[in-house]
């Protein structure tokens, strides 16, 4: 999981979601694409 100031989709499978006020990117195709804004 990368913690970034700015999160963006890296591939077509990435989804931007909001959990408990934190913006996250989850990706089923490539788990290395997981990101969290912080």
Curated annotation (Swiss-Prot):
Keywords on record: Ribonucleoprotein, Ribosomal protein
GO biological process: translation
Top-rank taxon: Bacteria
Signal peptide segment: none
Protein name: Large ribosomal subunit protein bL36
Record-linked InterPro entries: Ribosomal_bL36, Ribosomal_bL36_sp
GO cellular component terms, A-Z: cytoplasm; ribonucleoprotein complex; ribosome
Gene Ontology MF terms: structural constituent of ribosome
PANTHER family: 50S RIBOSOMAL PROTEIN L36, CHLOROPLASTIC, LARGE RIBOSOMAL SUBUNIT PROTEIN BL36C
HAMAP family for this protein: Ribosomal_bL36
Family, as annotated: Belongs to the bacterial ribosomal protein bL36 family.
């Amino acid at each position: 999981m990368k913690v970034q100031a700015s999160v963006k989709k890296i591939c077509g499978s990435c989804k931007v979601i909001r959990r408990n006020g934190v913006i996250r990117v989850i990706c089923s195709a490539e788990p290395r694409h997981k990101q969290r804004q912080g």
